Amino acid sequence: MQTFLPTPDFLETAKILDNKRLNKQIVEAYQIFSGRVPTKNHPACLMWEGHEYDLSRYIATLCSEYYMRFGKSHAIREHLQDVKFYSFDSTKKPFWLGDGLFHFSQRVNLLRKDFDYYHTKKFFGGISKDSLDCYPKGYYWPVAKPNGTAHKDRMNWIEWSSENNF
């Protein structure tokens, strides 16, 4: 489970994602939003906790891009119409939105998934296919429970950023 954010801008992110990931992001983000996840302790769930308004905006933006690409609404778009957005705090932004290391790790991992597609996109310059092994494996999770894999991945990214003056 993952919500990709190679940039802090939801619209830029939606436009950057390849078709497969765009669809998958809508589904996975909605699963997090609706609480239909195998575990609520997953770092992808934890990072959005208290930020339901922004998560719903992320989903709506992805759904709009889906419509632009495919000329039809994503089925999840209908579910968002019933959401009472006023019940969410729209002033509390995720602390990790805009964190350079977080967004960079997202770009690295998207390149690992489909280098040929992503290496031509804005914000992905300067990372060659050969250099991908220089970066930590896993994701830089902004929120992770101690002693788990996600925490270890987070610490590996922090160590890498310190060693490389990122």
Briefly describe each language-model feature range.
Residues M1-F166:
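Expand to "…catalyze enediolate/carbanion chemistry for C-C bond making/breaking, isomerization
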